[in-house]
Curated annotation (Swiss-Prot):
All copies of domain Autotransporter, residue ranges: 1649-1952
SUPFAM superfamilies, per database record: Autotransporter
Keywords from the named record: Repeat, Signal, Virulence
Residue ranges, annotated region (15 X 11 AA tandem repeats): 101-252
Signal peptide residue numbers: 1-27
Source organism phylogeny: Bacteria, Pseudomonadati, Pseudomonadota, Gammaproteobacteria, Enterobacterales
The protein's name in its UniProt record: Putative surface-exposed virulence protein BigA
Keyword Repeat: yes
Sequence repeats: 101-103, 104-113, 114-122, 123-133, 134-144, 145-155, 156-166, 167-177, 178-188, 189-199, 200-210, 211-221, 222-232, 233-243, 244-252
Matching InterPro entries: Autotransporte_beta (IPR005546), Autotransporte_beta_dom_sf (IPR036709), BigA-like (IPR049865)
PROSITE patterns attached to this UniProt entry: AUTOTRANSPORTER (PS51208)
Gene name for this UniProt entry: bigA
NCBIfam families noted in UniProt: auto_BigA (NF033178)
Length: 1953
């Protein structure tokens, strides 16, 4: 079933369901009691009606609207269902010739020949008429006026039946130029038979005249319709004796404007629908008309009749019909399509131009009851009584045009209709009050040009209840009364167009789904002058129509979720809100959803509460203009632009205020939100944001208080007004704050321009630790904001501030325009809180800010900050007065770049001026600043965390005062290419910040001196470089450049020192370059220092810093001698190491004065330095494989970072003030490593030497191997924490010497916090002890040998663990000791409490030592040396005594507790207690063990930064293609130390310029040390690449072509591959075959060969089968002729690749004899397709096919039959073939012809079963097939065009089949065919082809078509039919030589009765 059919059937089913309530009315009408009731009950006198039975009285009520209509409706629905079925199902469409509208005599209605027919009253009469000139009802004669049928031949438009007037009429048509329906003849135009032979398309019968006529026609010049003779006057019968000849009957069809169509040929009236007086609509119906008893009658489909007493046609061509029902009651079908039916209580008043007055009340109730019907045009009706209409009744119907109606009094309508006023041009005045409920409708006004005025009040309540419904066009409505609409009611519902509404009354609307005014029509004009109150989900005005214009001058208050003042769903409308608008509690104000609407607000709007929105601009291309003020608070939104491509103009002010909610919490709000895309928003008014919080106030916290939000994409926003923010946050309640955002821009591609500036007034109370952030502009995303105009910021805040003029991140952009002016007035609150905010903040890569305007700050304020890869520039003027702010903390960077990739540029033309009247003062440390510990210090430009700051060429920085610094970096880079002017004297400023005087301030530390540039930090936080290539001028006082710890300052430009007249200075006051706190300054070779002041000096340094001078120094314009006193500091004679060798390089340098470094360096080669090395800045890396030898001392000073060794480091001594990292595989050898301060030595590799710890803070963490080599020296001495981790080792290779330390770990300074933990292995040999401690005065500190720890002692001269006072020892691991008199653990000699605990294993001697005799004698496991010492061998402890004469315990103790295991394994003399042992011996006596506490854990190493790259590191090249060109040139990569790696290829661009199969690509790679040439490959599998190096070390590549036949792996393409190899050249075809993979080549060869182009051949075969099915399904028309057609758009007419066709099938069967017949078949199909859809395949684009068939059937007795058939099909097809691979995308067009010949012969026998209900026919036979396909040549694809020769195939198939035909009971039937058989023989010719691009070469083509399979056909059809339902199901599947086709179709037909 096609979708259209399905949709229509569903619609019909729904309609049927809705009409289910007709059934009772139909049943009531069919009651037998009807036969006893008179037909004219309504016309009977009251006394006679009283005598009627209740059934008669009841019948009209039940039957009132429905009964006699229902039959016609049901018939119509059934007809529609049938029509749908025939249209969309599978059956053919057949022409249908309607019966003649006559019985053979004169046409109806008949005339008797007289002049009049009854009934007549003397005036206008009813049919038949004589011949008067007045309008009459049928029949008419020939008058000139408009008449009703039948008409004569007048000049006016008439209604049926029509004759032949000059006006357009409805079919039958005469001979118009358009296509018409059959019959056709053989004319030149497409027609449907039968036609004569005229040139025009005509409808039968035609004569052949010059004009198109409708039969019968003579040959006259005028178009006429029957009956006509040929006379001068057109007339229609009946005619009497006039001059005209009588003509045949009129069968014209006329359609009227109110949905009535008369068909004179069928004598029917068709009604499109019936509107009822209660507003509902019935389906239409078809009724017959006739004359009965001299009166017109209408007859419904089920036989009910209506009498017609009047038929009029209005000026609007509406047919008005009225009369009486069978029961005599009045009925009318009026000009608006209403079916008006009187019941027995209805008062009926009819007649035109009458006046009716009534003050009688009305009380009517009951379904379908009607109180009064007033019918007639231009009536004047005055009704003043009260009325009550309930329970489905209709109070009054006024039907007629031009009526004037005045209605007053009180009306109550409940579930009913108050009044229906139907007709055009009516005027209605309402003066009373009306109450509507229960789904009722007060008034329906249906008609054009209606005028309505209401001065009464209305109360409408309940779902479905409606005040006024206006259905017509051009209505004019004036309402002065008040309306109340509640609970789903609707005040007014207007469906007509061009309505004008003026509402001056007040309106109250409440409750969900309640609507005051609902407009569906177009071009409405609505003026609301009254006030509106809307709540509870109600809607004030809803406009669904287009081009509506609405003006609200009254005030509107709308409240509650779901409520809305105005909703515009239509398009191109306009609305003006001139009154005030109040939106609260989640309501919406004015919403535009459609397209092209314009909303304008000139009043003031107030919006408050969450989810409340004042104005919503949704939809597309809408416009909103606001000239009034919008006040927003309490989480409301003033205006929401959620649509796209809209224009918003906001002229009034938008006031966004934070106010307290019901819980006393200050809440948020949003002024304007733009969430749609591509909108234009122009804000010409001001946006004012205000918040004022007292000390104890509470704030919501989120979301922020926001002025304008732009959240969509591609929007343009212009703010011409001012953006004003006033935030007074004095709340001191903890955690209470509410952020403020003036403009928030998210999304991408938005463009925002602020021309009026931003004004921010701010104050805060930070004592609670939280304060609101005030942001003027927030940009997130790829959008641009431009700020122009004058902006001001006044803030009283903490240091750093909480006011940000602009935050930009995530790729956004901010531009402060040339005319932008920003004035900042700031004062700081004394507090310990501070922020890192700035006036302009950028964050993230791709984010930028550019200032082109003027920024002035009165008071200290950071102006610009760039973070995390963002870039900020200044080309305008920035002026900061860093004046006293009454705060102890106000340090600031005016511009700052923080984070790698971040940069701040002071661009050409830019000026940054910094003036301070303060002096530096000590304060808390903030490490990002170069002067870490000082406040009142200010930086014009500063880089931190490895950002960059640049003062560009042409840019200027002015500095005045003490503690001011120009271009600086604590960590990062600072570059000056422009000009820096510094005057270090402290200014005195007047009230206007003019400098009145200056004075010198003596700094307490020299680094506090103002400086033009600064690099590094006063502490160990520096890692920076400052370079000057421009000009620095220092006047009176200050430094040109200063380098601090970790900083290097390099002068490559000019530094000039000057002094004002009369200014005298002192040493170190005016200096060119100063190096302090470990910094390095370098006057480079291009650097110049000009000293033009007497007290100026070139350099200054302290003892930890360095000066290097390679440049020029001039004194008063002349070169200065190095010995001149103006030199100041002396340049160092140490050598500055600026680089270390790369891999493979070696370097040796010698300096008697030593070396120093100033930045991070990495050694990858072999470096030997003869002299001391001072590392002053950055990291020092010795990388894996590298060797660094220092014949001297390496000192890692505090200004450096650390040393990280991965290679081999050999130094005489190393002293470090930073942690040191010896990483895995690293090796350090040194005599002494000195650890200074709080540093850690992480040894993960090998360490040989000694370590000295000089404080109680050093830590040593060993996970590698450590060895002390010098005799007598300890591995570690001093005070330190030591962690020997699991698997790590400590050992000594030297020997103990007298007076030596003779121990591996020597703790020489005791402290109760020091920790020693061994979890690895310590091996002490050659007389060494493992651990030795001095005596301490602290409480005992534990030393651990943990469970994984092993301590070995071999012949120690002193105890292996030799503890002093103040240490406990806990052994949880293993201790092995050997040697005479050796002691494993010895406690300190002390009266302190000391615990020596073993819960592990102590071997006194070893098992191996026992065997080889090396254990010695006199050994002790644990020995005490004090009377407070306790020895404890715990329950887990084991002591094995292997040595002779040795002991587990000994010495002086308080007690010895043994709960463990002691094994005496010696040969002799061993015991538990050594002689002389003292102390209580508790051996397994229940004494508790001492618990060893958990050992402390070692610190973690953390991460080490990435070192600088190896300059000689091979560059790994991958994913690189060497491009080649047609001229033989190629791209060249120049590189040294290059390794050619994976995926490096050479492309085949050269092939387009040469047909050579071997090509050399020269110098593809040039440089030194290039490796990996063998890795080069080709981008194409067709070419082989071989890289090689020439004599210069450059790489050439030889490209050799492979044969296609060798590369291709698909055997089906070998033939074309060989042909292409043979014809190889360099055209487009061949270059396209340079594909990347074998699979791609296989695919390309298949495509170019045409082997995959099979669809056209297959579709032709399918098309032949489709014709067979279409012909078989053709229904017979007559005499054996069958006809069937299918057209494009029908699913049955679809082939693959979006191909469709039109197909016609004709079949003529001729009975030759009683047992023989001959069938002739012909068909034609026209095809239309989109061509190929698959690469390599072809597809139909057009063409046509013809089918010829001849069948002969001979029947024999007993059901036997012999059938023979012959088919010939010819297909002339246009097609295209797609070639698409790589960069190729070609379409080759061609046309070809295919012919198909088939002969089939079969024998069959039919068996009849089940009483002829079932027929079974088995059959068998043979089929011969022959297909011929002509050759073809392609075009439009250039080198890819194929030329294909012709081909043919022949096949013989066996046929075995079975047919079933079943005709069952109850409407069921079925058919089925199952046919199959093997292919007996199949042969196919070999096709060859050639390609245009491979001239002279041909190749075989195999399309893969095969025979030999089993072919088959299966069909099934099931049918069911009943009186009102029919179902057809058909399915088929066909297969032949692998080509298949299948289909399924389901048709359902339902007839509604």
């Amino acid at each position: 079933m096609n979708p259209m059919q399905k949709k229509k059937l569903i619609s019909i089913a729904i309609a049927l369901t809705l009409q289910s309530y007709y059934i009772p009315a139909i049943a009531a009408e069919n009651n037998d009691d009807e036969k006893e009731c008179p037909s004219n009950i309504s016309s009977l006198p009251k006394e006679k009606r009283a005598k009627l039975s209740p059934t008669c009285l009841a019948t009209p009520e039940n039957d009132n609207h429905w009964g006699w209509v229902a039959g016609g409706v049901a018939a119509l629905v059934a007809g529609v269902a049938i029509g749908v079925e025939n249209n969309g199902g599978g059956d053919s469409n057949h022409s249908y010739t309607p019966p003649k509208p006559d019985n053979g005599g004169d046409v109806t209605p008949p005339d008797d020949g007289g002049n009049v027919t009854p009934p007549d009253d003397g005036g206008n009469v009813t049919p038949p008429d004589d011949g008067g000139d007045d309008n009459v009802t049928p029949p008419d004669d020939s008058g000139d006026d408009d008449v009703a049928p039948p008409d004569d031949s007048g000049d006016d438009d008439v209604t049926p039946p029509d004759d032949s007037g000059d006006d357009d009429v409805t079919p039958p048509d005469d001979s118009g130029d358009g296509d018409v329906t059959p019959p056709d003849d053989s004319g030149d135009d497409d027609v449907t038979p039968p036609d004569d032979s005229g040139d025009d398309d005509v409808t039968p019968p035609d004569d052949s005249g010059d004009d198109d006529v409708t039969p019968p026609d003579d040959s006259g010049d005028d178009d006429v319709t029957p009956p006509d003779d040929s006379g001068d006057d057109d007339v229609t019968p009946p005619d009497d004796s006039g001059d005209d000849d009588d003509t045949p009957p009129d069968d014209s069809v006329i359609t009227f404007s109110n949905g009535v169509t008369i068909d004179k040929g069928k004598d029917t009236l068709t009604f499109d629908s019936f509107k009822l007086d209660n507003g509902s609509v019935l389906e239409g119906a078809v009724w017959n008309y006739s004359e009965q008893d001299n009166q017109w009658q209408l007859t419904t489909a089920d036989g009910k009749t209506l009498n017609v007493t009047g038929w009029d046609v209005t000026d609007a061509n509406a047919a008005v019909i009225e009369g009486t029902q069978e029961n005599g009651l009045y009925w009318k079908y009026d000009s608006r399509g209403y079916l008006i039916i009187a019941d027995d209580n209805t008062t009926v008043i009819s007649g035109d131009d009458q006046a009716h007055n009534s003050d009688r009340g009305m009380d009517i109730s009951g379904q379908d009851r009607t109180g009064v019907i007033i019918s007639g045009d231009r009536t004047v009706n005055t009704l003043t009584g009260d009325s009550s209409v309930t329970d489905g009744a209709t109070g009054m119907v006024i039907s007629g045009d031009g009526t004037t109606n005045t209605i007053s009094g009180h009306s109550t309508v409940d579930n009913a209709t108050g009044a229906l006023i139907s007709g055009n041009g009516t005027t209605t005045n309402f003066a009373g009050d009306i109450a509507v409920s229960g789904g009722g409708t007060a008034i329906i006004i249906d008609g054009d040009n209606a005028t309505i005025k209401n001065t009464g009040t209305s109360d409408i309540s309940g779902a479905g209840s409606t005040g006024t419904v206006i259905d017509g066009n051009n209505a004019r409505v004036n309402n002065d009364g008040d309306m109340t609409i509640t609970d789903g009611g609707t005040g007014g519902h207007i469906t007509g167009d061009n309505v004008v509404i003026d509402n001056a009354g007040s309106t109250t609307v409440s409750g969900a789904d309640a609507t005051a005014l609902y407009i569906e029509g177009d071009n409405a004009l609505v003026i609301n002058e009254g006030n509106q109150t809307i709540s509870g989900g109600a809607v004030g005005t809803r406009i669904d129509g287009d081009d509506a214009h609405t003006t609200n001058t009254g005030d509107i208050a709308v409240d509650g979720a779901g409520s809305a003042a105005v909703i515009i769903n239509g398009d191109n409308g306009s609305l003006t809100q001139a009154g005030d608008l109040l939106v609260t509690d989640g309501a919406m104000g004015i919403i535009t959803y459609g397209t092209g609407n314009e909303a304008k607000n000139t009043g003031n709007a107030t919006v408050r509460d969450a989810d409340s929105v004042g104005f919503v601009v949704a939809g597309e291309k809408n416009t909103f203009k606001n000239k009034g003020d919008i006040d927003v608070s309490l989480n409301g939104t003033g205006a929401l632009v959620s649509g796209d491509m809209s224009q918003v103009t906001l002229d009034g002010d938008i006031n966004v205020v934070s106010v307290q909610d019901s819980e006393g919490v200050f809440s948020s709000a949003t002024g304007v939100s733009v969430s749609g895309d591509s909108n234009a928003v122009d804000i010409t008014g001001n946006v004012n944001i205000s918040a004022d919080y007292g000390q104890d106030d509470l704030a919501a916290g989120a979301p922020p208080l926001t002025g304008v939000v732009v959240g969509g994409n591609g929007n343009t926003v212009t703010l011409n007004g001012a953006l004003n923010i006033d935030d007074n946050d004095l709340s001191a309640t903890g955690g209470q704050y509410l952020d403020v955002v003036g403009l928030s821009v998210t999304g991408d591609d938005n463009d925002v321009e602020i021309d009026g500036g931003i004004n921010i007034t701010h104050s805060e109370d930070p004592l609670d630790g939280t304060s609101a952030d005030i942001t003027g502009i927030s940009v997130s995303g790829n959008s641009t904001v431009t700020l122009n105009g004058h902006s001001t910021i006044d803030t009283n805040t903490v240091v750093g501030g909480h006011v940000v003029l602009a935050r930009v991140n995530n790729g956004g952009s901010l531009i402060l325009g040339d005319d932008s002016v920003v004035d900042v007035n700031v004062s700081y609150i004394p507090t310990g809180y501070y922020t890192y905010n700035a006036l302009l903040m950028a964050d993230g890569e791709g984010t930028s800010i550019e200032n082109k305007g003027d920024i002035t700050s009165h008071g200290v304020y950071s102006v610009i900050r760039a973070d995390n890869g963002s870039e900020v520039s200044n080309s305008g003027d920035i002026l900061v007065y860093a004046t006293s702010s009454n705060s102890s903390e106000d340090r600031a960077a005016i511009t700052r770049a923080s984070g790698e990739g971040s940069a701040v540029h002071n661009k050409a033309g830019g000026d940054i001026t910094l003036i301070s009247d303060q002096t530096p003062q000590g304060s808390g440390g903030i490490e990002v600043y170069p002067l870490k510990w000082y406040t009142h210090t200010f930086y014009a430009m500063m880089a931190s965390d490895y950002g960059d700051v640049v003062n560009d060429e042409g840019a200027t920085i002015h500095l005045q005062g003490a503690g001011v610094y120009g271009v600086t970096a604590s960590r990062g880079k600072a570059l000056n290419e422009g000009n820096i002017y510094l005057d270090g004297l402290v200014p005195t400023l007047d009230d206007e910040n003019n400098i009145t005087s200056t004075s010198y301030w003596q700094p307490s530390s020299l680094y506090l001196t103002s400086s033009g540039m600064v690099a590094g930090s006063t502490d160990a936080d520096g890692d920076a470089t400052a370079i000057n290539t421009g000009n620095i001028t220092v006047n009176n006082a200050g430094f040109g450049m200063m380098a601090l710890n970790g900083g290097t300052a390099i002068n490559q430009g000019v530094i000039t020192l000057t002094a004002d007249d009369g200014v005298t200075g002192q040493a170190d006051e005016l200096v060119g370059m100063a190096a302090l706190n470990g910094g390095v300054v370098i006057n480079d070779t291009s650097g110049v220092i000009n000293i033009d002041a007497d007290y100026g000096q070139a350099f200054l340094s302290d003892s930890s810093s360095y000066i290097i001078n390679n440049g020029s120094i001039n004194l008063n314009g002349s070169p200065m001698d190095d010995t001149d006193s103006h030199m100041g500091g002396t340049p160092t004679d140490k050598i500055w190491i600026q680089s270390l060798p790369g891999s493979g390089d070696s370097d040796t340098r010698t300096s008697d004065t030593g070396f120093f470094t100033a930045g991070t360096l990495a050694n990858y080669g072999t470096e030997t330095l003869n002299g001391d090395v001072d590392v002053n800045g950055g990291w020092l890396y010795n990388e894996a494989g590298a060797s660094l030898t220092v014949n001297g001392t390496v000192t890692i000073n505090g200004g450096a970072n650390a040393l990280a060794n991965y290679g081999t480091l050999d130094a005489d001594a190393i002293s470090t003030w930073h942690s040191l990292f010896n990483e895995a595989d690293g090796s350090i050898t040194t005599d002494l490593l000195t650890l200074n301060g709080d540093v850690t030595f992480y040894n993960n590799g090998d360490f040989t030497g000694s370590i000295a710890g000089t404080s109680y803070q050093q830590e040593i963490v060993n996970t590698g191997d450590m060895t002390v080599a010098e005799d007598g020296k300890s591995l570690v001495s001093g005070s330190f924490y030591f962690y020997n981790e699991e698997d790590a080792t400590l050992t000594n290779s030297g020997s103990a010497v007298e007076g030596g330390e003779n121990t591996i770990i020597n703790l020489t300074r005791a402290n109760d916090s020091l920790t020693q933990v061994n979890s690895g292995t310590i091996t002490a040999t050659n007389g060494y002890s493992a651990i030795t401690t001095v005596n301490g005065s602290n409480d005992p500190k534990w030393i651990w040998n943990t469970a994984t720890g092993v301590i070995n002692g071999i012949n120690p001269d002193a105890p292996l663990i030799n503890l002093g006072r103040g240490y406990n020892f806990g052994n949880q691991g293993t201790i092995n000791v050997q040697g005479d008199n050796a002691v494993a653990i010895s406690g300190g000699t002390s009266s302190y409490v000391i615990n020596l605990v073993n819960s592990g294993t102590i071997n006194v001697g070893t098992e191996q030592g026992k065997e080889d005799g090396t254990n010695g004698t006199g050994l002790i496991g644990i020995k005490g040396n004090g009377n407070a010492t306790t020895i404890n061998n715990t329950a887990d402890g084991v002591i094995n005594v292997y040595a002779d004469d040795s002991y587990a315990f000994g010495g002086k103790t308080k007690a010895i507790i043994n709960n463990g295991e002691i094994n005496l394994l010696c040969d002799s003399g061993c015991d538990i207690y050594a002689p002389g042992t003292t102390g209580t011996q508790n051996d397994h006596n229940g004494t508790a063990d001492i618990v060893i506490p958990d050992a402390t854990t070692a610190p973690t190493e953390g991460s080490i930064p990435t070192p600088p790259a190896d300059p000689n590191a091979p560059q790994q090249l991958s994913n690189y293609i060497v491009g080649t060109n047609a001229d033989g040139s190629s791209g060249t990569l120049k590189a040294n130390n290059l390794v050619i790696g994976d995926n490096v290829k050479v492309d085949t661009g050269f092939t387009s310029g040469t047909a050579d199969t071997t090509v050399v690509v020269d110098n593809a790679f040039t440089g030194s040390n290039i490796q990996g040439a063998d890795n080069i490959t080709s981008t194409s599998v067709v070419w082989n690449a071989q890289g090689s190096q020439d004599a210069d070390g450059n790489v050439d590549v030889t490209m050799t072509k492979n044969a296609y036949a060798d590369v291709a792996t698909d055997s089906s393409v070998s033939d074309v591959a060989q042909a292409l190899d043979a014809g190889y050249t360099n055209n487009e075809l061949y270059t396209s075959l340079n594909v990347g993979t074998t699979a791609e080549l296989n695919s390309a060869l298949k495509q170019v060969s045409g082997a995959q182009a099979t669809t056209v051949f297959r579709e032709a075969r399918v098309l032949s089968n489709r014709f067979t099915m279409l012909a078989d399904a053709a229904p017979q028309i007559k005499d054996g002729l069958a006809f069937n057609v299918v057209a494009k758009g029908d699913p049955r007419a679809e082939l693959g690749n979006d191909t469709q066709y039109d197909m016609l099938a004709l079949r003529q069967t001729l009975d030759l004899t009683a047992s023989q017949n001959l069938t002739l078949e012909y068909g034609i199909a026209r095809l239309d397709g989109d061509g190929s859809k698959t690469a390599g395949d072809n597809g139909l684009t057009g063409g046509y096919s013809q089918f010829f068939g001849l069948k002969h059937s001979m029947a024999f007795d007993e059901g036997l039959a012999w059938n023979n058939s012959l088919r010939y099909d010819v297909h002339n097809l246009d097609s295209s073939r797609s070639v698409a691979y790589g960069d190729v995308n070609k379409i080759a067009d061609s046309d070809m012809r295919q012919q198909y010949l088939e002969f089939r012969s079969e024998g069959a026998k039919t068996f009849t079963m089940m009483g002829d209900a079932l027929k079974v026919t088995p059959y068998a036979g043979v089929k011969f097939r022959h297909t011929m396909e002509d050759g073809y040549k392609e075009r439009s694809a250039g080198d890819f065009n194929l030329s294909m020769n012709s081909g043919n195939e022949t096949a013989v198939d066996s046929i075995v089949g079975l047919k079933l035909d079943y005709a069952g009971k109850d409407g069921w039937s079925a058919t089925a065919t199952l046919e199959g058989g093997p292919n007996l023989s199949y042969s196919k010719s070999q096709r060859t082809a050639s390609l245009q691009g491979a001239a002279g070469q041909s190749f075989g083509v195999d399309d893969g078509q095969k025979g030999g399979g089993v072919n088959g056909l299966a069909t099934i059809g099931v049918k069911y039919s009943s009186n009102d339902t029919a179902l057809h199901l058909d399915a088929y599947q066909w297969k032949e030589d692998g080509i298949s086709d299948k289909g399924f179709m389901l048709n359902v037909k339902k007839t509604f009765r």
